[in-house]
Amino acid sequence: MLLYDLLLHLLSPLLLLLTLIDAKRRGGGFAFIRERFGFFKRSPANPRLWFHAASIGEVQLALPLIAAFSSKGVLLTCNTPEAFRLAKKQLSADVEVHFCPLDFSGAVNRLLSHYQPSALFVVETELWPRLFAEAHRRRIGIFIINGRIGHKTSASPRFIKKLYRQALAQVTYVWAREPIDQQRFIALGCPEERISSVGDIKLSRPENAGLPTSPLLSTPYSLAISTHHDEEQRIARAWMAAGKPNLLVIIPRHPPRAANIAKELADKGLICHRRSESPIPPKSTDVYLVDTVGEVANFCAHSEFVFVGGSLVPVGGHNVMEPAMLGKAVLTGPHTITQGSAVDYLSENNAIAIATKEDELASLWQRLSTDNAWRQQLEASAKRAIDKLPDRVQIYREQISRVID
């Protein structure tokens, strides 16, 4: 751990620079810089429970759990400005939402002293050695929710694996996503008696059925969500090859990229407008870029179909269950390793279309745009698949209730 602390301090100028860049580029502001180094301006509300959800995906998973325990006093920390904005928009005002400090001893201890939580719930895969060590030293229970360990983490260098082992030694309990994740946690050093496989919270029957009301657009559109660099151009090419069947709406994974995306697509001769500048796109618009936060569900619900990004580039995919739970036809690319269980489940139920290469993306885009019967078949299959899911959110609520009561 001493070597880890020394390395962090040696890297502190670089980490400060990266934090400053992120604050400016991603709209975090001064609060992002201050809190990432453990300085919290507001007086402590003494929340009992601390949830940590690194980015947008983890925040979305945590929202129903946080809502269930908000009366007990909840602090939610995030790593990114986008996740912070989503949490502030979706959660009630009595939930404290802040940025998580970097893993410096001083920064971590300032947060722990400021809020004095009794339990820490980490969503998915955030194993921070210093944070876990300091929380354990203060006898704060550490729990991992929907624990996931990917192949890359399992194949980490020996030095990194040693740090993971040290972090996992401090963990009170891990609720793993799947048996394979449970095995990987154990291989990294998690004691067998402190882990069980509870199921993937993403594969949980939604509690509030029905589509969001009041569509944000009056014109038909196809939708691409959670896109990454280079995906927007590939999607636009597929959409053009399909004959520009309707308006193309793109919601990038990181909204601050929208200006650059608009320029890149405009250079290809496409007319682009951003939602932050044009709440209603002009009729001449080819591509409408949604650079706002908290509107994905509405755009999904009223789209013709939904392409889920992070899958045309080796990111590993994003949450294909979100549009499926809204009864939409779902299209994805080949890179879905982080969403394997969800993609497999929808595939087994004939509720997803997968483009294995770029020219196939164009043909599937065209078919989804023109073959109403096939699109409706995918929608019906998605609804049936979702109806069969267990209520894993409730299972996790029960697990959390047992350890805090």
Where are these regions (language model features)?
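Nucleotide-activated sugar donor-binding and catalytic core shared by glycosyltransferases
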Residues: M1-D405
